[in-house]
Amino acid sequence: MQITARYYGFFSRVTGKLYEALEVGDELAVKGLIEVLERSYGYKFSRLCFIRPLYSDREYLNICLNFQDLNSLQKFPMGLDTRLKEGDLVSFGVMGGAA
């Protein structure tokens, strides 16, 4: 299946791209996509997927799926195990970072 990955801020610096179309397996979850992209762009890519604000003791995902914040347990109760579908748009780096 085909999905689109959109890169903002530091993600675009790490990848050298603003977006790309990706052909991925039918059963791929968000966690698997991070692993695929880490193999292409290195460990720094996967570390950027998680942010920890100074005021918090927990990490947050720096990822949106179809313009929806993946941190929302109401919309995405499976979190990183949320399965991707044909045509999905996965955005990296929409929170924080530099343009």
How does the language model describe each region?
Residues 1-99:
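Ubiquitin-like/PB1-type beta-grasp interaction modules and other compact soluble beta-rich domains
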